[in-house]
A protein has these predicted regions:
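Short, intrinsically disordered, low-complexity terminal/loop segments
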Residues: 1-2, 28
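Bacterial N-terminal signal peptides
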Residues: 11-21
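A contiguous pocket-lining binding segment that forms or flanks enzyme active sites
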Residues: 205-220
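Bacterial N-terminal signal peptides that target proteins for export
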Residues: 2-12
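Transmembrane beta-barrel domains of Gram-negative outer membranes and organellar outer membranes
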Residues: 28-167, 171-176, 181-201, 219-222, ...
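Boundary at the C-terminal end of the N-terminal hydrophobic targeting segment
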Residues: 23-26
Length: 293
């Protein structure tokens, strides 16, 4: 049982204020040079003994795939701000000319979300995310337990979150999961993300526990351009026929990420992904992200 106060809303407001304060002071090079063949896929400007969570991983530039989490680490006291934007226009309804007259969904409003993420301690990050869908707040933690290297073939992160609708006042949905990734040189990242979500269908009061296994990948096709895709099939629980999926093209510019994506739904939290996508639907959207470390 959760005890709800206004502290959650106050905390999120302070967090968003903090990111804009950080932005005013942040200075960062506009681009990252392409590594030579002798350079490793993971690079760092840190001196020995400093927090290696700040190392640049060329195959994994962002904390999200599209909607699923990645295994990217956040250094202690570092932060990140991200905006998710999913337009309301369904590109699979109407003719090409009709969609074009609505600028392919841009004229039909959007579901917008904002996330602030902070490095609480070494290998540990916390985030607060708010999306317009059902006015949902999600509070989120990730512990990066294993990093791929000579002694480990995979990176593994533990995930925990709780989300609530109507500004975190009802329909609470806690979630537990792990994110597992495998980097292939500095060109390819593969992901498997099993997540258990409770109370997925609070309104319907049915199939309250759901397990899904998200699968994703990111391919670096040039120095700073990536192709990204994910699918989120459900293993058990809430069971509409359509699994959520999406694909995207992504551009990295220094500490900034811009991703233009297409999804068969507008959900971005664990609970929303567990409810699946929408049949015969495709929505244009984008993610914008900025790192401060």
């Amino acid at each position: 049982m959760f005890v709800i106060t206004h502290r959650s809303i106050v905390f999120s407001a302070i967090a968003l204020l903090g990111v804009f304060t950080s932005a005013a002071a942040a200075q960062e090079p506009s681009s990252t040079p392409e590594p030579s063949p002798s350079q490793p896929a993971i690079q760092s400007d840190a001196t020995p003994g400093e927090d290696d969570d700040a190392e640049l991983v060329l195959a994994e530039p962002d904390f999200r795939v599209l909607n699923l989490p990645s295994t990217l680490r956040l250094p202690r006291n570092g932060s990140s701000f991200q905006m998710t934007h999913r337009f309301n226009g369904n590109l699979r309804q109407g003719s090409f000319n009709e969609n074009g007259s609505n600028l392919f969904g841009l004229d039909q409003g959007a579901a917008v979300g904002f996330e602030y993420r902070f490095g609480v301690a070494r290998h540990l990050q916390a985030a607060v995310y708010r999306t317009a869908i059902d006015k949902t707040f999600q509070f989120y933690g990730k512990y990066d337990a294993v990093r791929q290297g000579d002694s480990a073939p995979l990176s593994v992160s533990g995930l925990v979150s709780v989300e609530g609708a109507d500004n975190f006042q009802e329909h609470y949905a806690p979630a537990l999961g792990i994110a597992v990734s495998r980097m292939v040189a500095d060109r390819l990242a593969l992901y498997a993300t099993p997540v258990w979500v409770h109370n997925v269908a609070a309104i319907l009061n049915t199939d309250r526990d759901t397990l899904f296994v998200g699968i994703g990948g990111r391919v670096r096709v040039s120095a700073t351009v990536y192709l990204v895709a994910e699918v989120v099939p459900r293993v058990s629980g809430y069971s509409p026929d359509t699994a959520a999926y999406g694909f995207a093209i992504e551009k990295r510019a220094g500490g900034h990420i811009f991703q233009l994506n297409f999804n068969n739904g507008q959900g971005t939290t664990f609970g929303q992904l567990a409810r699946g996508g929408i049949a015969d639907s495709l929505y244009l959207g984008f993610n914008l992200a900025r790192k401060f470390f």
